Amino acid sequence: MTRASPAAAQTPEHRPGTVADDPAATAADAWKGVAAAAVVVLCWSGFNIVSRFGSTGAFTPFDMAALRYAVSATLALPFFIRDIPVAQYPRYFTLALFGGLGYALFAYSGFALAPSTHAGVFVNGGIPFWTAVLLALTTGLQRSRKIVVSLLLTTTGLVLITAESLFAPLEPGQWLGDVLFLCAAASWAIFGLLVRRWQPGARNAVVGIAGISAVIYLPIYVLWLPKTIQSAEWGDLALQGIYQGIVAALLAAGMYAYATARIGASRASMALALVPAVSAVGAYALLDEPISLLAGVGIVVVSAGAGLGAWAPRRKAAV
């Protein structure tokens, strides 16, 4: 009976010759990964504001998801059919379940109940938290001191925002929106870890998510789900269609998959927690959403933890 070699038993991030273990490629790939993560931060900061605007306007959460996948699939489906082998469809179905439908529906439903500042904290601050938890549960990896401190800071910020949401007398239903945001974060964290393990490539990951999500979701939406999209103005349709379908579904998802492959799921997810500060300032300027003292402190703490984690020293195996 033959035994599997140690290399075969290792995950992609632990194999010799990968980005994590090649000193010659580490610095260049790290900068590329950080740059890609920075693009995602900008895209998702706008995503929080644009999605909140749509969810409190003429669109249901189901309308938002339909626009996201109708537009993205129009661009991506031909490449999916051409480039993805049928034997790999189950793997891409799983990626679409977590990085596509699960994330989008949880997030859009949350935007209908809670402000975009909460999304910035619970989604983008929650992703590194869930990523670390899932890594600990599935691999037992030990975290560096800086990563542990950054997670503590992120968690502290989440607790501050949670306290405000749960006990706010004017909007008692915000807690449900926050729970939905945390579910969206968990879904995206699973997606990031699967991308890191399976290494589908950024383009294949994007077209796979868009194509499969559209094929599954759009018939259900047209036949059974509540919709108010018919009453929306053309300008609102264009804004949501372009941002949700191109910027969020294609550009941001592709850059995140690229960043995950270059710097690991842990560091890429940490960078995303920088979104709250950008989202809060944008929401204040564009949506007139106030930032309370407690929320402001929580946003600062989460962002500090994200920055510390994203730029923590790399160990031999990036995860």
Tell me what each language-model feature is:
Residues 2-63, 156, 166-197, 215-216:
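Glycine-/small-residue-enriched transmembrane alpha-helix faces in small-molecule transporters
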Residues 29-33, 57-66, 85-90, 163-186, ...:
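Juxtamembrane helix-entry segments on the extracytoplasmic side of multipass membrane proteins
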Residues 54, 64, 110, 137-143, ...:
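Hydrophobic/aromatic residues within transmembrane alpha-helices
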Residues 63-74, 99, 108-142, 184, ...:
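Specific alpha-helical transmembrane segments that line the substrate/conduction pathway
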Residues 67, 104, 119-126, 194-215, ...:
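Helix-helix packing/entry segments at the starts of transmembrane helices
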Residues 73-76, 130-137, 151, 167-226, ...:
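Transmembrane alpha-helical segments that form core, pore/gating elements
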